[in-house]
């Protein structure tokens, strides 16, 4: 009949947390409703949420430090608080793979460290694919790295050598000081990449 029907088991394969979720912050939706919207792909647009689904949303919000904001308007939250809520939204349907696009871009450094700790815990039960330009920071938290700059460079480890960095066509130096990695970029020479 030309219709592609996915089994229910494939509908929740992915969860997605964007770099910045753009929305009208005056839109009258509360934190719980945002988290529950992560179930829309399996429920459809016009079905109401069950008590068990609401409880799962509240449990996730409690787990990630947002329990006190369950009924707060989403537009009243800080950047870090919104990322927690959108993370709950991304995982409420129990995906097998979580895709993150620059998830710490708009958060402060205190929350950034906490966020990576949350991801480490989540990574015990699901796979995580993260896009980041902050190679120096994520090296401490990831198992493998795939770098893309004109071509794909896959590293089956979180360790990258100076020789490997040269192949990225962009001068990068990594310095690690204890558990706090740093990234220093040299200035590009004119006419060179």
Model-predicted regions and their roles:
Residues 112-124:
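Helical segment within the ABC ATPase nucleotide-binding domain
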């Amino acid at each position: 009949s030309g219709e592609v029907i996915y089994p229910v088991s494939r509908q929740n394969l992915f969860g997605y947390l964007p770099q910045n979720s753009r929305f009208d912050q005056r839109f009258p939706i509360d934190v719980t409703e945002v988290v529950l919207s992560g179930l829309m792909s399996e429920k459809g647009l016009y079905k109401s949420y069950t008590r068990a689904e609401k409880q799962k949303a509240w449990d996730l919000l409690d787990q990630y430090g947002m329990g006190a904001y369950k009924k707060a308007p989403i537009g009243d939250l800080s950047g870090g608080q919104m990322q927690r809520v959108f993370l709950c939204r991304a995982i409420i349907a129990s995906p097998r793979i979580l895709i993150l696009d620059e998830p710490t871009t708009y958060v402060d450094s205190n929350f950034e460290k906490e966020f990576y700790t949350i991801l480490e815990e989540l990574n015990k039960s699901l796979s995580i694919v993260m896009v980041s330009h902050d190679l120096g920071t994520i090296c401490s938290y990831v198992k493998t790295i795939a770098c893309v700059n004109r071509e794909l460079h896959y590293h089956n480890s979180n360790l990258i050598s100076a020789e490997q960095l040269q192949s990225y066509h962009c001068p990068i130096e990594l310095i690690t000081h204890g558990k706090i990695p740093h990234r220093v970029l040299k200035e590009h020479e004119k006419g060179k990449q």
